[in-house]
From Swiss-Prot:
One BP term from GO: response to antibiotic
Transmembrane segments annotated in the record for this chain: 514-534, 549-569, 598-618, 623-643, 655-675, 765-785, 1196-1216, 1230-1250, 1281-1301, 1315-1335, 1356-1376, 1467-1487
Keywords of the record: Antibiotic resistance, ATP-binding, Cycloheximide resistance, Glycoprotein, Membrane, Nucleotide-binding, Repeat, Transmembrane, Transmembrane helix, Transport
Domain of life of the native organism: Eukaryota
Taxonomic lineage of the native organism: Eukaryota, Fungi, Dikarya, Ascomycota, Saccharomycotina
CDD domains: ABCG_PDR_domain1, ABCG_PDR_domain2
Pfam families: ABC2_membrane, ABC_tran, ABC_trans_N, PDR_CDR
Functional description taken from the UniProt entry: Transporter, whose physiological function is not yet established. Confers resistance to the chemical cycloheximide.
Chain residue ranges for the region called Disordered: 1-30
Sequence similarity: Belongs to the ABC transporter superfamily. ABCG family. PDR (TC 3.A.1.205) subfamily.
Protein's gene: CDR1
SMART domains with a match to the protein in the record: AAA
UniProt name for this protein: Multidrug resistance protein CDR1
Membrane topology, from the record: Multi-pass membrane protein
Binding-site residues, ATP: 895-902
Length: 1501
């Protein structure tokens, strides 16, 4: 075939394939079967024809034209399918034909190109270079060096000209991808595949593109793409991020609405178009049956993982992008499903002129044959780009050998791994070795010269063409009215907001529990809080409580939206993805979220405020109530917008919650109640001016008190002996009272106590609305311009000391060659192969060689049957499975998805937590499993679950110390760890931290560590591996299989599940156990050389012969009907049960049981223990590991320190050196009360780290019997105490001394003892915070639920601790809450320790003036009253008596039920509450999280 035309023979092939395909594609809307076998064969042959030569632009256009007209299509507007009456165009019909629909659409576009203005886009680049500001290795910051690292990085940031700061991610490379071409990007993890795709998609935040790089998109620059056509060039990450409670149909319709073009055809409204497009893609990708099913995620039930991946694909397709960059989109998919996806991309490229690029792992040959172009990357170097059919020939010509049955993609990728590539005989010294040498060879090749010529012509062509103007016209034609032509978005801002509001209402509909619970929760809290102040009297005795109730109402309304920060971070990844797809502006989503939450906010506000207002007995007047509610709802709006702004500017939840908590504290203190306006210190008065909550509180207090008269509740003097005194000689104690008057004006009270005035009432409403609008504008601006989280390259983290050693070692090994790879210098390839494949490994050390544990025991099972109850129906998952695993053998466990492979592993290893084993036996040398079985095996799980803050060596040592026999010395265990490190080839990163994705070990290194953790335990019986190659590239999968072979050759027995392995990988296994659906055995036996024994078995019982070039594993899946679209000719379970091979298996099991049971058993009592290490050792190691985790998490520790320091200092200096007058005593009491405010944030900071430890323990360490549950929970509790004591000590000094409480101990010379006791109380509070968080988390699955529960308990504790309302005011029903409240005793102890035994001196405005009767002095008149009521007086010049109600702080303490004599008792009670928390944590964890009993219940035979 030439570059410009197809031969007539090719045309006939194409026409025949398409016609056959069209006739076979009418499929059901409810189920997606993929292509049938006949169609698959046609497309594969067609793909080989198409990819034999790459089409240039003109030939591609000719092909498209041919495809358009080769079948009779009407070329009508498909969105009118009801009027057209053509089922092939109706996605809701069973006869819908996706290809027919696409061809019809293409013909429609061609019928009126001036109206539809179709567009296409290619890309070409030369000298493309990407670089980052980081290193490939770094050190993990700890508490001691984090600040130094931050400072040095900040210093380096300003060194603009320091080239040492930069490193190349992609070296200079060139390529061209034209419309209609499908390109695959191949390379090992870290080669730069993702960076290349992100660069093409102009998704470069986090790294930089070199100035010398030239990139053009058919004449458009990357700046043009990013600013104006962002949605036409997209990057699709491998993760599936969606709103879990939104249905599939709603998710896709939302994307379709936002990309609905203006030129969609006359008479077609937007809703019709969007629904039709969503239905088309749901039908195309087999999602129609999931239209009304929630998408879900790992925690929310929804569609399956494969369907969720298809939802992501459909959503990206609906964006209508011309260039699509798919990053590892097939990860986790089996080869058949991946092939279906690539076929869909091929169809899109050929028919619709799109330009897809995909980075793919484990690419089958059928999939590779569909690609037009291939890019091969090696450590950031491009070592080949060109036609996919020419790549293999290019490298073979270079001198490399492609092993038999190795796919082309695997061969190309293997060339970037020195341990796997193999030169042809005679080429050992001729082939390039390093990545740089490969690139040099490539750039000197004729293929590269031809490429550069083509690229040069392409750039010249782009300069001459009018693509820029044409593409702009196409883009503008799609845009709706009121949309800027330069905008990358298709619809206007108003429409984006409207669609966003509709989507948010659908989210609420999908999960109505959240708004319902919120409204109900507000109602319940309204009932609880109002009952504390129930039915306040209309006297001056209610003044304080009315103020307290109003204060609490304002705070509750203000801070009810604090948790909106959490929802922001939940939605942020989705919003960022949609921004890159150019669906909507983030600011439009921000505004939509606020509008959509208005009904819920109004309902929540009314449910709380209506109940609270009338139960407290506030002013019962409709106008007063609605003003109260109006101020409260605007207060909610203000704080909602403020908290959202904090969340928008923060990069993490913890980073947002800490400043939010400090801000909350400031607003609480400076509202005007805790510190009345006249009492605020001069330096801090401005805080009240900018505090929106203060304006709300003033207006509500004016609304409640202005114009009202209150009956005086207490007179001075009064009581015995004063019954007949005239009112003119008494005065009311309330502020604002007038001597001789029984009523006190509320207006006067506000003016005297708070300096609040009625003239401010409506003014404050305007100020509050102004704050709301201001913070709304700030929030919208921040969401629009905040770039989000920066992308990070892969970095290996070491401890600081280890990093220096690592760099010295690397420098020494690479001396003289900065580009040297893992095998540098003149290493002979024969020596290299021997080094890699050497399986007689010994560790040379001071103690000589370390031997691998010898295993002579055989594990076998018979008639294993397992069932679970699903919807009240017992379902059999495993059906009478037999088998064995012998030392030195690797047994593969295979089967279709859902066949029960992992379930069988869990049953064999006694790890099932649900369901029942109803029949069968599991035997070791003929004996039943004992209590030590689980620690006698190794189980390598599919998930690589490790603690991020541990190094590789520490993780291995931890496992060795706790799982090897306690008789073995520590030195021997350490030597064995070193042995395993070398065995697994982990020496280079043995001291690296596990880290997280991007900053830590890569996928392969994590998998090796997972295997190592099990090996260092010296499993004496066998090793289970569950999908060890899942998600890995083919080279890594191969290295893992070679590792298993090495272990088996050392005598290890291995049982490994594997999903559709390649022929090379399959050859590493000795035996196969294959399960059909329902857990029924289809085959168990030897594989033989090249799997010939297995092939002979199936051919013997009627299977079609296996082609020589076929992968035996894939052939077997087709035979038994386990591959997509395949159907078995017979039930191979019945074939197996009736076969002679099955009878031989049963006889061998019976023989082993009879003979092995006679062998002597190990009678060592220690060998039968459930855990190898004693409990005290488990506890110490677990506690130390947790302490180290926190130490290496400086972000956690410093955020905790920043929170307590800022909160304590702010608190202390707000009440700086509080005086001992009446207001000063109240201020000191509220300072103690405010000291507890950081509780919630401290709990929220701590819980994620608890969850990390718990996940590692429950997923891996508990089932393997590494240590007991009691050691885990005890270690978690005690390891947190040192940090809590440390931050408590810091908080004590930052709060106690600025507040000046030590001055109160001076008169009694008890500064030191009272200071020590206060320190003990403060640190006890912080310890209590940790234990309360752990208690809430002990039985909770999610940290969010535990945090919400802790918040509820904390709120209840604050309400009933006696500060806002004492026991004499509380309704009788709530007295028990006062008595059972730990904060009651803590507050009493802190107040009595801080305030007792000193004098009170009233401020001038706190005196009340009493005029004694004629002829009496102040002394004779007031002394009787002072004897029983307390206080003191001063005689004024005019003869009146200035009376102060208190003379001693003990009087104040008595009024709040705090006695100095009970301080130690109260401290002891509070410590008892801590102990109760600890005990309940242990009990609840055991009840809720520890598996109890066994899952075995044999049926009676």
């Amino acid at each position: 075939m030439s570059d410009s035309k197809m031969s007539s023979q090719d045309e006939s092939k194409l026409e025949k394939a398409i016609s056959q395909d069209s006739s076979s594609e009418n499929h059901s809307i409810n189920e997606y079967h993929g292509f049938d076998a006949h169609t698959s064969e046609n497309i594969q042959n067609l793909a080989r024809t198409f990819t034999h030569d790459s089409f240039k632009d003109d030939s591609s256009a000719g092909l498209l034209k041919y495809l358009t007209h080769m079948s009779e299509v009407p070329g009508v507007n498909p969105y009118e399918h009801e009027e057209i009456n053509n089922d092939q165009l109706n996605p809701d019909s069973e006869n819908f034909n996706a290809k027919f629909w696409v061809k019809n659409l293409r013909k429609l576009f061609e019928s009126d190109p001036e109206y539809y203005k179709p567009s296409k886009l290619g890309i070409g680049y030369r000298n493309l270079r990407a670089y980052g500001v980081a290193n490939d290795s770094d050190y993990q910051p700890t508490v001691t060096n984090a600040l130094w690292k931050l400072a040095t990085e900040g210093f380096r940031h300003f060194q603009k000209d320091d080239d040492s700061r930069y490193f190349d991610i992609l070296k200079s490379m060139d390529a061209i991808m034209r419309p209609g071409e499908l390109t695959v990007v191949l390379g090992r993890p870290g080669a730069g595949c993702s960076t290349l795709l992100k660069t093409i998609a102009v998704n470069t935040y986090g790294f930089h593109i070199g100035k010398e790089s030239q990139i053009t998109y058919d004449g458009l620059s990357p700046h043009d793409i990013e600013r104006h056509y962002r949605g036409d060039v997209i990057y699709s990450a491998e993760t599936d991020v969606h709103f879990p409670h939104l249905s599939v149909g709603d998710t896709l319709e939302f994307a379709a609405r936002l990309r609905t073009p203006q030129n969609r055809g006359e008479g077609i409204d937007r809703e019709t178009y969007a629904k039709h497009m969503a239905s088309v893609y749901m039908a195309t990708y087999g999602l129609s049956h999931t239209r009304n099913t929630n998408v879900g995620n790992d925690f929310v039930r929804g569609v399956s993982g494969g369907e969720r991946k298809r939802v992501s694909i459909a959503e990206a397709s609906l964006s209508g992008a011309n260039i699509q960059c798919w990053d590892n989109a097939t990860r986790g998919l089996d080869s058949a499903t991946a092939l279906e996806f690539i076929r869909a991309l091929k169809t899109s490229a050929v028919i619709l002129d799109t330009t897809p690029l995909i980075a793919i792992y484990q690419c089958s040959q059928d999939a590779y044959d569909l690609f037009d172009k291939v890019v091969v990357l090696y450590e950031g170097y491009q070592i080949f780009f060109g036609k996919a059919t020419k790549a293999k020939e290019y490298f073979e010509k270079m001198g490399w050998k492609c092993p038999q049955r190795q796919t082309t993609a695997d061969f190309l990728t293997s060339l970037t791994n020195p341990a796997e590539r193999e030169p042809l005989p005679g080429y050992e010294d001729k082939v390039p070795r390093t990545a740089q040498e490969f690139e040099t060879y490539w750039k000197n090749s004729p293929e590269y010269a031809e490429l550069t010529k083509e690229i040069d012509e392409y750039f010249v062509e782009c300069e001459r063409s009018n693509t820029r103007e044409t593409y702009r016209e196409s883009h503008v034609a799609k845009q709706s009215n009121n949309t800027r032509p330069a905008s990358p978005y298709t619809v206007s801002f108003f429409m984006q907001v409207r669609y966003g509001v509709a989507r948010n209402f659908l989210r609420m509909k999908g999960d109505p529990s959240i708004p319902i619970f919120s409204v109900f929760g507000q109602l319940v809290m309204g009932l609880i809080l109002s009952s504390v102040f129930y039915n306040l009297s209309q006297t001056t005795g209610s003044f304080y409580y009315r103020g307290a109730a109003m204060f609490f109402a304002v705070l509750f309304n203000a801070f009810s939206s604090l948790l909106e920060i959490m929802s922001l971070f939940e939605a942020r990844p989705i919003v960022e993805k949609h921004k890159k797809y150019a669906l909507y502006r983030p600011s439009a989503d921000a505004l939509a979220s606020i509008i959509s939450e208005l009904p819920v906010k109004l309902a929540m506000s009314m449910s709380f405020n209506f109940v609270f207002y009338f139960m407290v007995n506030f002013r019962r007047n409709p106008g007063r109530f609605f003003f109260y509610w109006l101020m409260c709802i605007w207060c909610t709006f203000v704080m909602s917008h403020l908290f959202r702004s904090i969340g928008a500017v923060s990069t993490s939840i913890s980073g947002a919650m800490t400043p939010a908590t400090v801000l909350l504290l400031a607003m609480v203190i400076y509202t005007g109640f805790v510190i009345p306006t006249p009492s605020m210190l001069g330096w801090s008065r401005w805080i009240n001016y900018i505090n929106p909550v203060g304006y709300v509180f003033e207006s509500l207090m004016v609304n409640e008190f202005h114009g009202r008269e209150f009956q005086c509740a207490q007179y001075v003097p009064s009581g015995p002996g004063y019954e007949n005194i005239s009112r003119s000689n008494q005065v009311c104690t309330a502020v604002g009272s007038v001597p001789g008057n029984e009523m006190v004006s509320g207006t006067n009270y506000l003016a005297g106590a708070y300096q609040y005035y009625n003239s401010h009432k409506w003014r404050n409403l305007g100020i509050t609305i102004g704050f709301a609008v201001f913070f709304l504008a700030i929030y919208i601006a921040l969401t629009e311009f905040n770039k989000g989280a920066m992308q990070k390259g892969e970095i290996v983290l070491f401890l600081k000391g280890s990093l220096k050693k690592h760099k010295r070692k690397t420098a020494a090994s690479n001396k003289g060659d900065i580009e040297a790879g893992p095998v540098a210098g003149k290493l002979d390839y024969q020596d290299e192969a021997e080094a890699v494949n050497n399986e007689k490994f010994t560790e040379k050390g001071s103690t000589g060689s370390v031997d691998f544990p010898e295993n002579r025991e055989i594990f076998f099972w018979r008639d294993l049957t397992y069932q679970v109850k699903i919807k009240k129906e017992d379902r059999v998952i495993l059906d009478h499975v037999d088998g064995w695993v012998k030392p030195g053998q690797i047994t593969a466990l295979m089967g279709a998805s859902g066949a029960g492979k992992t379930t069988l592993l869990n049953c064999l290893s006694e790890r099932v937590t649900t369901g029942i084993i109803t029949d069968g036996e599991r035997l070791v040398n003929g004996h039943a499993l004992d209590s030590s079985f689980q620690r006698s095996i190794g189980y390598v799980q599919q998930q690589d679950v490790h603690l991020p803050t541990s190094t590789v060596r520490e993780a291995l040592q931890f496992s060795a110390y706790l799982r090897q026999s306690n008789k073995i010395s520590k030195k021997e265990k350490d030597d064995y760890v070193d042995y395993v490190i070398d065995l697994l080839e982990m020496t280079d990163y043995a001291d690296a931290l596990v880290g997280v994705a991007g900053e830590g070990l890569n996928v392969e290194q994590r998998k090796r560590l997972t295997i190592g953790v099990e090996l260092v335990a010296k499993p004496k019986l066998l090793l289970f591996l569950d999908e060890p190659t899942s998600g890995l590239d083919s080279q890594t999968a191969w290295s893992i299989c070679k590792l298993m072979r090495k272990l088996a050759d050392h005598g290890q027995a291995i049982l490994c599940t594997i999903h559709q392995p390649s022929a090379l990988i399959m050859a590493e296994f000795d035996r196969l156990l294959f399960l059909q659906k329902g857990g029924r055995t289809a085959y168990f036996g030897e594989l033989g050389e090249n799997c010939q024994t297995m092939i002979n078995y199936f051919e013997k019982y009627g299977a079609d012969p296996c082609p020589k070039e076929a992968n035996p594993a894939e052939w077997m899946l087709q035979v038994v009907g386990a591959a997509p679209g395949s159907h078995a000719k017979q039930d191979y379970f019945e074939v197996w049960r009736n076969s002679s091979e099955y009878q031989a298996v049963r006889e061998e099991i019976n023989r082993m049981e009879a003979e092995l049971s006679k062998l002597p058993r190990d009678n060592d009592p220690e060998a039968l223990l459930k855990y190898a290490a004693p409990l005290w050792k488990q506890y110490l190691l677990v506690s130390w590991r947790t302490i180290v985790q926190d130490w290496r998490s400086p972000g956690y520790i410093y955020s905790k320190i920043f929170l307590v320091v800022s909160a304590a200092l702010f608190n202390g200096f707000s009440f700086f050196k509080a005086k001992n007058n009446m207001q000063g005593l109240q201020n000191q009491m509220f300072s103690v009360f405010m000291f507890f405010i950081p509780f919630n944030t401290l709990v929220q900071q701590m819980l994620p780290y608890f969850v990390k430890q718990r996940d590692v323990y429950e997923v891996r360490e508990a089932p393997s019997r590494t240590f007991s549950w009691f050691a885990f929970i005890a270690g978690q509790i005690t390891s947190e105490i040192p940090y809590q004591v440390a931050v408590g000590t810091i908080a004590f000094f930052c709060w106690y001394y600025p507040l000046g409480l030590y001055n109160n101990a001076t008169p009694t010379d008890s500064v030191n003892p009272r200071g020590v006791l206060m320190w003990m109380l403060v640190t006890a509070f912080y310890v209590y915070t940790a234990t309360m968080g752990q208690l809430c988390m002990s039985f909770s699955e999610l940290a969010d639920n535990a945090a919400n529960l802790a918040t509820l308990l904390f709120t209840m504790c604050l309400n009933f601790c006696g500060v806002l309302a004492g026991p004499d005011v509380l309704p009788g029903f709530w007295i028990f809450m006062y008595r059972c409240n730990p904060f009651t005793y803590l507050v009493q102890a802190m107040l009595s320790t801080g305030l007792a035994n000193t004098f009170v001196k009233c401020a001038e405005r706190e005196y009340v003036s009493v005029k004694p009767p004629n002829g009496e002095s102040c002394s004779t008149y007031l002394d009787p009253y002072i004897k029983f009521a307390g206080g003191y007086f001063e005689t004024r010049n005019d003869g009146s008596c200035a009376f102060c109600q208190m003379s001693s702080t003990n009087t104040f303490l008595k009024s709040v039920n705090s006695l100095y004599s009970e301080r130690w008792r109260n401290f002891g009670i509070f410590i008892a509450f801590i102990a109760i928390n600890i005990i309940l944590t242990v009990i609840f964890y055991w009840l809720a999280r520890v598996p109890k009993g066994n899952r075995e219940k044999k049926n009676k035979k």
